């Protein structure tokens, strides 16, 4: 695996125009060399690792993320998310992100992804908005998507 992927000037993105396809993954792809989502896999969980996750690190939600390096990015129309890490508190994780088609978030901007926990089945509650669901993006040499 390779990574992490970091954009050190993340603070300067506040209020800028969306990039790429305007989807969340497009932001991290534009500002880092993380590549296509097909090869993304989960690195360390972000929550609780604030001292070990650099500002500007590309982070995302992953399916099957219980084991590091075994998860994959779903790349679905909803229920997954990618962003650039800023910081964290006991309430959640601050990220810089973009959303295609969200009239309330027309530009790249920072926001708090609150810690929302997991459902009984182990899936994350509202993963696109849940700081608990974020892991550092790493890149695999082979596709991580199920066949």
Regions found by a protein language model. Give the residues of each.
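Secreted/periplasmic proteins that engage bacterial cell-wall peptidoglycan
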Residues: 1-82, 87-88
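Aromatic- and glycine-rich peptidoglycan recognition patches
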Residues: 3-15, 86-147
């Amino acid at each position: 695996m390779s990574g992490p992927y970091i954009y050190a000037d993340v603070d300067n993105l506040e209020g800028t125009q969306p990039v790429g396809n305007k989807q969340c993954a497009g932001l991290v792809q534009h500002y880092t060399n993380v590549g296509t989502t097909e090869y993304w896999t989960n690195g360390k969980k972000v929550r609780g690792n604030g001292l070990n996750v650099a500002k500007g690190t590309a982070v995302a939600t992953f399916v099957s993320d219980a084991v590091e390096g075994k998860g994959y990015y779903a790349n679905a129309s909803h229920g997954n998310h990618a962003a650039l890490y800023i910081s964290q508190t006991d309430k959640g994780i601050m990220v810089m992100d973009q959303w295609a088609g969200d009239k309330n978030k027309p530009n790249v901007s920072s926001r708090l992804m609150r810690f929302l926990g997991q459902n009984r089945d182990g899936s994350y509650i509202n993963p696109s908005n849940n700081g608990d669901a974020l892991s550092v993006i790493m890149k695999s040499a082979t596709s991580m998507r199920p066949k």
